[in-house]
Amino acid sequence: MIDLRALREDPDRLRASQRARGEDESVVDRLLDLDSRHRAALARFETLRAEQKSVGKSVSRASAEEREALLNRAKSLASEVKSAEAEAEALSDELTTLLRSVPNVVESDAPVGGVDDFVVVEEVGTPRQFDFTPRDHLELGEMLGAIDTERGAKVSGARFYFLTGVGALLELGLLNLAMQRAVANGFTPMIPPVLVKPETMDGTGFLGEHAAEVYHLPADDLYLVGTSEVPLAGYHANEILPADALPTRYIGWSSCFRREAGSYGKDTRGIIRVHQFNKVEMFVYAHPDEAHEEHLRLLAWEREMLDLIEVPYRVVDIAAGDLGTSAARKYDCEAWLPSQGRYRELTSTSNCTEFQSRRLNIRYRDTDGKPRFVATLNGTLATTRWIVAILENHQQEDGSVVVPEALRPFVGQDVLHPIAKK
C-alpha cells in the first residue's frame, strides 16, 4: 500500500508512476479528494465528541433551569456523533479500498513502457554454436529418464510432470546448492507453509491483478502460494523489529503453485510453464534507506548461482508497465535456450519498498524510538525451470548432458547418459 502522507506531500510522484506503468492517473485526484473528505469528517466527529463529553460533564453541575436544555443538547449530540462517526468510518473504508488498489510507486529511473520495453543491463557468456541440431529440454529429459510429462498429465492433467532419476537429483542439487550459498551469505533457512490465509495473500499484493493466478481452497478459505515470498512476508506481520536486526534475511524452500490462467497455448511443451514447481527464494526485511543497495546484493547473489551452472544469461531491467503490483523495481536474469534461440527468465528480484509492510503492518523501531515501516525485497535463487537451461546448454550430440561442476557432488555423475526408455 502506498504512503498516504507522501501522496499528500508530492502527488506528482504518484502521477508519474502511474504514467510509467500505463495506469490511470486520475486515481491520484480521487485519493486526494477522499483523503480531504475523510479528514474533514474525522475533524467534525472529534469536535462533536468533545462537545458531547463537555455537555455530559456540565449536566451534573447545571441548575434546574439549565439542565433540561443541556439534556436535550446531549440527546441531539448523541445522534450527531453517531452519524459523524459512521460517515468518517465509511470514508475511511472507501479511502483504504482505493489505496489498496493502487500499485507501488516505481523508482524514478526504472524503464518506462510495457513488457517489451525492458533494458538489457548486461549479457554474460556467449550462446554456444552447435555443430549439430540441439534438442529441446523435453526430448533430452525423456532420453535421460529425467522428465515424464506423459505420466504427469495422466495423474494430474496438463502442465504437470514427474522429475525422475537424474531429473530429481538435478533439482535437489540445484536447490541444495542454493540453500548452501544463501546460508553462507547470512540467510536463515526456512521451510514455510504453502497454504496461507487471505490476509497474508492480499497483504503481499497477489489478490489484485494476479488473483486469477492463485489457487484457492474455498472450503478452508486458504490459498496455495505461488512463491515462498508470501509466507515469508507474512512471518513478521503485525510485529515491530529492532533496528539492529535489519537486514533480516530468510531463504525459503517451498513447492509453488500457479494456475497459469491466460497462458493457454503458451509453452505447452515441457516444464517451462507448469502448475507446480519447487523454488528457493530469498526474502529480506531491510531499512528503507538501504533497500536499493540490498536489491543490488540480491541480484549479485542470483548471478553467482547462474555463473555456477555455466549457462549464458543476461540481466534485464524490467519496464514499469511490466512490474507486479508490489514492486518498485525489478531485475530478471534470463538464460539462453538453444532450442528457442532466445533468452528465458530464470530469476527475478524485486524491491517492494514499504508497500507490503504497510499492508501487513511490519515495522522496525528506529533510533528515535518511533516505529516505521520496513522495506521488503525478494529474489529467486533456484527453481525447477533451471533444469531446462542446464539440459539444453550442456547437451552433447548423442543426447548426453555434461553436469555443471558445482552440481556434480549432488548428482553423483559428471555426465548424464541416455537410458533405454521403459
Swiss-Prot record:
ATP binds at R258, R259, E260, V274, E345, L346, T347, S348. Consists of two distinct domains, a catalytic core and a N-terminal extension that is involved in tRNA binding. It is found in: Cytoplasm. One of its GO terms (molecular function) is ATP binding. Catalyzes the attachment of serine to tRNA(Ser). Is also able to aminoacylate tRNA(Sec) with serine, to form the misacylated tRNA L-seryl-tRNA(Sec), which will be further converted into selenocysteinyl-tRNA(Sec). Homodimer. The tRNA molecule binds across the dimer. Its main location: cytoplasm. This is Serine--tRNA ligase. Belongs to the class-II aminoacyl-tRNA synthetase family. Type-1 seryl-tRNA synthetase subfamily. Keywords: Aminoacyl-tRNA synthetase, ATP-binding, Cytoplasm, Ligase, Nucleotide-binding, Protein biosynthesis. CDD domains: SerRS_core. L-serine binds at T227, S228, E229, E281, T380. It is an enzyme of class 6 (ligase). GO terms for cellular component: cytoplasm. It catalyses: tRNA(Ser) + L-serine + ATP = L-seryl-tRNA(Ser) + AMP + diphosphate + H(+); tRNA(Sec) + L-serine + ATP = L-seryl-tRNA(Sec) + AMP + diphosphate + H(+). It holds the Pfam family tRNA-synt_2b. Its EC number is 6.1.1.11. Pathway: Aminoacyl-tRNA biosynthesis; selenocysteinyl-tRNA(Sec) biosynthesis; L-seryl-tRNA(Sec) from L-serine and tRNA(Sec): step 1/1.
